[in-house]
């Protein structure tokens, strides 16, 4: 299964990514094992820790997850320009809400209605 995830650092920085293994990926971001993104690794070197805010599951392919990830980041940037007072977390969550209200994430993506199971958001409590 493929996932698109939203993580937040202890200082409030945010990151959106895609993976097939959530447990391994968060360990990579926190530099417990090799393979984290440069953007998150630098924060860890400064003592920050990353944790999941939420993730979206049920993508039929990894490619569909990547399309969703790209669009989530794009909507987040648009929201930041429209309302710079939003916190990074607010911006990401609002973008996710808007993205899930669409029929599909991008013009070349599958319709959500064609997924075997519709995208589902799982929040970390």
Enumerate the predicted regions with their spans.
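Residues that flank catalytic or metal-binding motifs in active/ligand-binding sites
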Residues: 1-3, 48
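Generic intrinsically disordered, low-complexity segments enriched for polar/acidic and small residues
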Residues: 2, 12, 26, 56, ...
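GIY-YIG nuclease signature motif recognition
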Residues: 3-9, 13-20, 25, 29, ...
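Compositionally biased, intrinsically disordered low-complexity regions enriched in proline and serine
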Residues: 6, 16, 56, 60, ...
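Generic alpha-helical secondary structure signal
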Residues: 7-9, 33, 116-119
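Conserved short loop/helix modules at catalytic or binding sites
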Residues: 22-64, 71-90
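Boundary/linker segments flanking structured domains
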Residues: 66-67, 73-125
């Amino acid at each position: 299964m493929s996932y698109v995830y939203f993580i937040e650092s202890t200082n409030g920085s945010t990151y959106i990514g895609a993976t097939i293994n959530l447990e391994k990926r968060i360990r990579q971001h926190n530099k417990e094992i090799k393979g984290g993104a440069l953007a998150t690794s630098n924060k860890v070197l400064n003592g920050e820790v990353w944790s999941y805010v939420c993730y979206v599951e049920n993508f039929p392919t990894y490619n569909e997850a990547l399309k969703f990830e790209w669009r989530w980041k794009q909507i987040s940037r648009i929201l930041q320009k429209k309302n710079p007072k939003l916190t990074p977390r607010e911006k990401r969550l609002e973008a996710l809400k808007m993205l899930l209200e669409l029929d599909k994430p991008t013009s070349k993506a599958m319709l959500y209605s064609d997924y075997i199971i519709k995208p589902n958001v799982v929040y970390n409590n």
